[in-house]
Amino acid sequence: MNLDEFSDFNIDQLLGPSAPLQDALVAPYKQVSLPRSNQDVYAKRSRLAERIAQNDELIRQVKQLQAQNKQLADLQRTAQEVTDLYQKEKQQRIELEKRTKQIGERCGQLEKELDVQVGNCENLQEQLQVRGLPVEAKDVLSILMQFSQRLGDDCGLLRRDQNIMKKLREHCKTIDVSVPTPKSPNSRSKRKAHQPGVNQSTQTDEEPADPKPALCSVAVQVEGLIETRNQATQHKNTTTTRGTTTASFIKHHDVGTCFPEPKPLPNIRQILDEMLSWRDDVVIEPMSPLSDLQQELQLEDVPTNASVATCTTLCDIHREIDFVTDLPTQIKVSASRPPSRTMLDSVKEEARSSRELAKELFNFLPQNQSCLTNLPPQAFEELWQVFGQMVLALLQRRSNPSMATPPSVSQADFTRWLYELYEGTENQTEQTSNGSTSKRDFATSTECMDTGTDPIIQSPNISHEGHVTPIRLPSKPKERKRKSKKRKAAATPKPIAKRKCLEMETNNELEVEREQTPETAIQFLSNLETFNMANCDNLEMELDEEELYLLQLTSNAKQNENKGNVRVQDPDDLKSPAQTSKFPKSENHLPAVLKETASSLKGYDEKQCPFPDKTEELMHKKTFEIQENIGSLTELPPNIDISAYPVSMAEVRIVSSNKPSEMEVNASEGTDSHLDKSVSNLDTGSMSLFGSDSDVESEYSIEQMAPELSDSDDTFDNSEEDCRSADEPSNSKKIRNSSLFGSESESDESEERALEADDLTEAEAKVEEKESEQKSSDVAPAASSGKLLVVEADLVTKTQPLFVEKLDLENTQHTSTCTNPKETDESEDEHGLVIDEQIFISQPEEPPLTVPIAAKRRRTQSELKTLSPPGEVRLTRQRAKQLLDEQKSGPEKGLSLVEQIRRQLKKAINKSEPFKKDSTHDSKKDSTHDLKPLEHEDELKAMQLGTNFEPIKLSCSISEESPASPPACEPMDELDPPPIEIPLEQAACTRKDDQHKSIVQHVLKMDTGLEKLVEANRKTLGKSQPQLCASIGKYLQENMQLESTCSDLAMDIYKVTKSEAVIVNAMITVICKIGLDDGPVERLLNALKYLNFSQRFLAELEERLFRNTKERPATELALNYVRLYLKATALQATMSAGYENPARLLLAKILYHFDQDMPPLVMEVLRQFPTALPHREQREYDNSDALITVIKHLLMNRQYDMQDPNGAERLLLSKLRFEYHFQPYEPSKQQVLENLVGKLKAGREEELGYAFALFCRRSPHLKVVESVVGEHLMPLATSYCDLAAQNELYDARLGLLLHCISLVLKPLPLDTDISAFVGFLKRLLVAVPRSGVQLAAVKASLRLQRFGFKYTLDALKDYRPNYELDPLTRAMIRCFAKRRRHFRHVAATGRRTEI
């Protein structure tokens, strides 16, 4: 390249430093000719190229700045135009407002003027009506007179018209009106008036007709045999009320009328008698002869006054008792005492007055009702009196449990008295009634009683001068009649049982045993004490061949022992139904008392059999309990003699009642039947009351099931502690939003374990002590005649039932210290064991001893505890331990459990001597269990108390003379006491242990035995915590994001711990230290998604934000929590469907819990989720959520600090005003309240409780108790309560309303008076027995415990549910008991412990 061409350029100067630009222009330079220099031309060229490139870049930037400057100028101009337009529009609006105001004032003036003009117009119209007449009044008179003169005098006016004309003339003279002179008469103008003609008619008599002879058809017309009744008949209505038995009388009064009474049609014999009685000389006349009309009109009008007098001192009568109403009515409870002490302590449910219950109650009545018909009048009067007393006691039992007293007469005495009363007067001759009597029931008169008898009329009055005649019992019972075979077969069909027993008796003897006495209403009432159940469908117990044989074996124990010729069948034929049958889960959960009664009734008879019989599986419901109890023989130890444990449960009850300090052994003495129902439903997956209620178990794995079994069995060795520690990770997934502002309860699993351990330790210690006492005692144990009394209420602490389908001991594993569920059963529902104590059986060989009747123990309500539902076989803890020991050291472990039991029973049958010696020997020899007899223990306790208790013969669940009981071994003459009076009023004194404890009292009692409180769930690991945080921090700071990194993180974390709570807590701590950059947060969300921890992550963030009410987190830390929450919320929304607007709910919680730091947190939520609140112009937005109105009201009625231009409060208000276009102070609190109440009345449940709570807590200048609760919520609750008492359509709304009221009252000051609401809750628990309303009322009362535990205890003292509680209610009750125990501990020691 030739450089001569560039001689005019100074290259050195071009490559030198450039001069600074001035106004983005390059300064010109002068060309100077320089000598040519030999330099590096290529280097200069490159520098020149770089300088040119820089210049081009500068030129481009200049152009870009010029374009931006132009845009900025345009924007400024546009902004100025917008500002001018805004000012112009504002000025126009001000002018328009002024003009509008002026126009409005002008309109007001015009309206006033218009009113004046309207009034004037109306006056003018009235004047026009007066003045607009054609002539004046004076002229009218003259014109009228002129017209009369023109007509003339002979115009045919009537006398009335002439009198009027005369009066007009006189009036004209009076007022000086000139009357024109009459004109001359004109003959042509006269008109003749029409004269009325006279009509004449004659009336003649009708032509007389020949009389016709009276005819009648002999074959058709007969005299109706209708007896008439005079209304003067005396009627008597005996009414039994609470406290009094009264009789009301209607006095004789004659109303002068007789009316026919409906009678059945005459039979053929009566018609023939009437026809043959006719004679020729008798003139047959019609039945209704023609009567004269005048005679009928002249009948006397006899007054129909009735004089009614009632001789009574009624005591609070609220309802008729001699009929069942069609519709259920509200039962008003009286404070008066019940009328009789013969009522039953075991009655705990109020009789429901519904048609369905009436049908069930009266199913026991025979169809022909011949028994009641044949009763003589006096017997009917006394029985009707007793019936009223019993029904009233049923109605009073639930409402006034403190008035219950023990019955003064036993059930057997009452039964004997009834049969004596019935049979003693059965053969009396029936008297015919007079013509004025009638039957009570026209429809069934031909079936129920003979014609012409009325037992009510013939019976004497039971009331003498206002005093009630007492009922005296006879000294000895008479022989009862047996029910015929034909009638029994027609009454109740029974299932065909294909069973074989050992050497049964002849069929004739079996037929005698199977005969039963007719079941009547009186027998049903006498057995109410035993059959304490809501549904009485199976009252008439039918026994099949096997059951009858079992009863016969028991009753003839001595005879079998003396004969010694009992043959044993082949062992292959002895198959237990528990081995061959599968028990289906019962979906029809019967009431607790029904299940207990049915099970004890049949199990009592069957467990007396020395061995199980071969039976085929029967799935029918009536025999299902029999199969269950036969299968329950598998609960007995396989290597223990069946007679080793004789015990009299009566003595156990008497001793336990005299020594209250031993009640801790029987931990569930006061447990109500509802508690077993509330924890027995395994299908729902819910845990027991003291289980983990706030945690949701995702699946039942081997890791989770083994600790549960080990927790239940506290008699194992100390190695089970490892299993308990492994149970902590199971508390993983908390239910989100279980309460609005924090959790209602904490998990309390170790509390149950400690309680069960204490109970079992005390029980074992006492049993061991009594074994040593038994060895030193020479008194031979005496038992009743083979009556097995397994009263679970005395010896049972209930947890979850265990379904047993088949026991297989060959598959057990001996290496595990914590038993696997497969070791005890192979069923699907494997949970904890049920019974904490041993099961004792009585010795069936010894004869019963006679005792006075006063020593008989009555059946207390605490015995009425529920057994397993049909199809469930439950194992005791003692039995579980025996199974485990048998696996280790049992010599017969190769055999099945049923086969071992069968061999033991065969040995017991073949023995010819009593089992007492062998039982003592076996109990000493067997070291694997601690089953000991209790009779020596009872005798020693009786000696210490100075009382000698003898074995008592009891009726377990039926009367001693009922058809299903075995025949007595000895005559009952020695047991007959002198006649006992049955008083008609109860005494005021009651035993404390006769009453059911409420569920709250039971929970409090169960908690009293714990010495230490449950420590809080730990969320850190201690020494391993840094390692866990390092693993998480390393993962969050990695640059590479792969799927494998999440799996590596999971492996590293699970090496340290598997606790979800610990891992999530560490994640939050680490991410807050690292910072919320996009990379770490994204990796954290990926890890949460991979580990499926997002739900726990949100719960932990909420706990850190809102749980600690005294110390809130700092503003920056709270902002980090909110940002993380919103990120995780977006992740959760993508993972789960139906997750609607969680940001709005977070916004409500922030407003509820934060006051000073609220603006930055709300600002952060609205930045990330701007759709949490709607814009004012956004019409398509869903505004149905009640939280929207409340949040807008709270945000726009707050006083903001506008001093700091960059402050969060100023920015938040600007965002609300200019982005969402919210108006200041809108909506008002009245509008919000009306909106919330309207949604409540409409039944919309979307976050309504949250909205009420937030509104009443943060709304300024709001009178919560007076305006919100007093004026709106409580009246609405009262009306809903009345509606819910009638039907269940308003249950959901009433429950929601109680939820809202409790959340509103919860944060109020402690001096607030809430007694009115607590009283309403008490009324509601009684008035509405349905579970939905009652659970809402219970939760509402538990939320108000911060005002004092007395309010909650007072509201729930009578709450005894018979349904299963939901997990939240159980958790709240457990938390209430824990807090109460905590504060009592603080009050006693002065030291605070962590709850």
UniProtKB/Swiss-Prot annotation:
Query: Which Gene Ontology CC terms are recorded?
Result: euchromatin; super elongation complex; transcription elongation factor complex
UniProt keyword list: Coiled coil, Nucleus, Transcription, Transcription regulation
Q: Where is this region: Disordered?
A: 175-212, 452-496, 561-588, 658-680, 707-786, 841-872, 908-936
Where is this chain's protein located in or outside the cell? Answer: Nucleus
Q: Where is the composition biased (Basic and acidic residues)?
A: 721-731, 763-776, 913-936
Where are stretches of biased composition, namely Acidic residues?
710-720, 745-762
Q: Does the keyword Chloroplast apply?
A: no
Enumerate composition-biased segments (Basic residues): 478-489
Quaternary arrangement and interactors, per the entry? Component of the little elongation complex (LEC), at least composed of Ell, Eaf, Ice1 and Ice2.
Q: What does this protein do?
A: Component of the little elongation complex (LEC), a complex required to regulate small nuclear RNA (snRNA) gene transcription by RNA polymerase II and III. Specifically acts as a scaffold protein that promotes the LEC complex formation and recruitment and RNA polymerase II occupancy at snRNA genes in subnuclear bodies.
Tell me what this protein is called. Little elongation complex subunit 1
- Natural source organism: Drosophila melanogaster (Fruit fly)
